[in-house]
Amino acid sequence: GALTALITPMNADGTVDFDGLRKNVKFQLEEGIDGLVPLGTTAETPTLDEKAGSEEDKIIEIVFDEVRKFEKTSGKKIPVILGAGSNNTKDAVAYCERAKNAGADAALVVTPYYNKPTKERIYQHFAACSKVGLPIIVYHIPGRTVLNIQTDLLVRIPELPHLAGEKEERGSV
């Protein structure tokens, strides 16, 4: 099915428009979307506060609140794949744990960016996230990460436990 990568609506002062987010989530659900992907790269995550009790936590709370209400009234299961990407492996693991604790169906984990890790470090990044026990989706977007995962590594990554899939944004498969 189709899943919406949710944007994070912002107010003019740069704060998150939580009412706008709630309206957007409700709209997506009422219009029949099959699943939601909050806190991915489309969601302005690098600009959000991520500390406990933060903007990110409030976004997670709103998304799951609306999804649970919709599931209760519609009888339909709505998968939520929570963005858990970071170029810092420790942070990515913590985001995967947060996704698991929130009740997400999977975590979307972007290829580590900026530091240009070796193939082995990329593999270890995804392996560390996989150990959380939540299904993970590898997010391969070389246009943003400046890393193109080579075919030999793409063949190796599926050996990891809890790998659910890959979101491919290379433009050529």
Model feature map: region roles:
Residues 3-146:
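Active-site beta->alpha loop and helix N-cap motifs at the rims of alpha/beta catalytic domains
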